[in-house]
C-alpha cells in the first residue's frame, strides 16, 4: 500500500485490527488470571499484584509508542521515509533501555514493591516468584510495543494482530502444560505461568522484527540504534509524555487502591485482580479508536491537510464515546454470566457484582 493511501482509509478499517490486537494483548494476562482462578484463590491474589506492576511499566512503554506513531505518521504523510526509519530505530532503542531498566528494578526491588502494596505475608513469596520472572518479560514487551506501533502506522494492523494471536496461543499451551501437568510434567504453578508469558513475548518480538524489517523492507541500521538525534527523540517525547500521563495516573490509582485492599486479605485482593482485568477490557473500544485516530490524523497533518485532521479528530471522539457506552451497557446486563465464567468462588462474586454499576458511569467519561 502506498503510504499516502493510509490517510484516506476509514477509521474502522484501521481500528478493528488494532482492537483485536490489543484485545489479544490484554488477553494474555486475563488468560493467566482465568486459568489460575480455577487452581487457587491464593495464587490469584498473588498474581494480581504482579499484573498491576506489569501494567504500570507497560503504560510507561506506551508513551514512547504514542509519540513514535505520531512522528512516523507525519513523516510518511510528508513523504520523508528516511526520517520515519530514523524515528523507528530511536524508539526501539529507547524502549529497550526502558524495558531493561524496569526488569532490573523488579529484580532488585520486587520484595519492596510487594510490601509497599501491602501484599498479605503468606502471598509475598508466590507474588515475588511470579513478578520477578514477569520482569524479564518487560524487555521483549517494550520492544514489541514499538514494533507493533510501527506496523500499524504503515497500515499493517492485521499483521500485528496475527502476531499477538500466535503469542497468545503459545502462552495458553504453555499454561496448560505447567498448570495441569500435561505430558507427565510436574505442575509449576505461578512460576510456570510467568515463563509461558515470557516465551510468548519473545516469539512475538522475533515475528514483528521480521514483518517490519523484511516484510516492509525497512533497512535495519545498527548505527541508528546507538547514535540518536536529540531533536528526533525530543519530538517523540514531547508528544508521548502528555499522552501517557492520564493512563499512568489511572494505573497508579489502581495500585494505590490495591495497597489498601491488600490489608483486607486474600479474597478482596483476588476480587480486585479480576475487576482490574475486566476494567481494561471495557476501555478497549476507546483505545483502539484513539490509536486509529492518531495514525489518520498524523498522516493528514504530515500531508498539510489540517482541516481534515481537525474534523477527523472530533468524529473519532464521538465514535469512541458511543461505542464505550454500548459496551458498558452490555457488561451490565451480562455481569452474572461473565463473573460465573471466570471464577467459582462465591465470596469473590459477591464482592464484584456491586462494582459493575460504577463502570456504567466511569468508563464513558474515561474515553474522553
Feature-to-residue mapping (PLM):
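Interhelical loop/hinge segments that connect adjacent transmembrane helices in multipass membrane
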Residues: 1-13, 194, 209-250
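Signature of the first transmembrane helix
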Residues: 9-69, 73, 241-263
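Helix-terminus/linker motif at the lipid-water interface of multi-pass membrane proteins
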Residues: 27-45, 114-121, 179-188, 248-281, ...
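Small-residue hotspots at the loop-to-helix junctions and early N-terminal turns
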Residues: 41-52, 127, 131, 194, ...
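Small-residue-rich hydrophobic transmembrane alpha-helices
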Residues: 44-104, 141-160, 271-335, 366-368
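Short membrane-interface helical motifs at transmembrane helix boundaries
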Residues: 101-132, 326-353
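Alpha-helical transmembrane segments of multi-pass membrane proteins
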Residues: 121-147, 346-368
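Membrane-interface helix-loop junctions in multi-pass transport and translocation proteins
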Residues: 168-206, 335, 350
